[in-house]
């Protein structure tokens, strides 16, 4: 009888431990962000990605134009940094909603880009004054991927 009570207590403790253990969270996505060492808004964008579940590695470079060129980002569509996520190029201060769409749809493009440094975009100061035009990067003519 005493052994059965001890066994019941042990089973209860094991059940409680299993029930209270946290479920495994989704693994963070890796992102590599290339930026100019002097750019603070790019650090803000890296923090934005981290706060939204990305594991971000920041690479400082004085030759961002070459990195953009190597990844197929046309000169007129370049943002102030380039991020690689799951094999896609993500140029500039693109909102998370658009990145999630890209990663879920997995289109046959090189990536997406938000040219320049628009006010009110993630990581940028100021108020959003107009919709963000986010372009596809790939072969062919310039095409809008999303408007935010």
Report each predicted region and the residues it spans.
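Local sequence-structure signature of Cys/Sec-based thiol-disulfide redox active-site neighborhoods
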Residues: 26-47, 51-52
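Short beta->alpha connector loops
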Residues: 38, 62, 116-118
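N-terminal secretory signal peptides that target proteins for export/translocation
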Residues: 1-2
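Thiol/selenol-based redox catalytic cores and closely related redox-interacting motifs
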Residues: 70, 76-148
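N-terminal, post-signal-peptide region of Sec/Tat-exported proteins
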Residues: 43-92
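Sec/Tat signal peptide C-region and signal peptidase I cleavage site
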Residues: 18-25
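Bacterial N-terminal signal peptides
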Residues: 6-17
């Amino acid at each position: 009888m005493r052994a059965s009570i001890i066994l019941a207590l042990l089973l209860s403790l094991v059940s409680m431990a299993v029930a209270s253990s946290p479920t495994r969270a989704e693994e963070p996505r890796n992102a590599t962000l290339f930026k100019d060492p002097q750019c603070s808004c790019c650090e803000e964008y890296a923090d934005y990605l981290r706060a939204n579940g990305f594991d971000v590695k920041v690479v400082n470079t004085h030759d961002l134009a070459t990195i953009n060129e190597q990844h197929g980002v046309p000169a007129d569509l370049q943002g102030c940094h380039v991020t690689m996520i799951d094999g896609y190029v993500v140029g500039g201060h693109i909102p998370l909603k658009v990145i999630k769409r890209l990663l879920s749809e997995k289109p046959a493009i090189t990536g997406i880009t938000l040219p320049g440094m628009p006010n009110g975009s993630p990581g940028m100061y100021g108020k959003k004054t107009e919709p963000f035009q986010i372009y596809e990067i790939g072969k062919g003519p310039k095409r809008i991927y999303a408007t935010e």
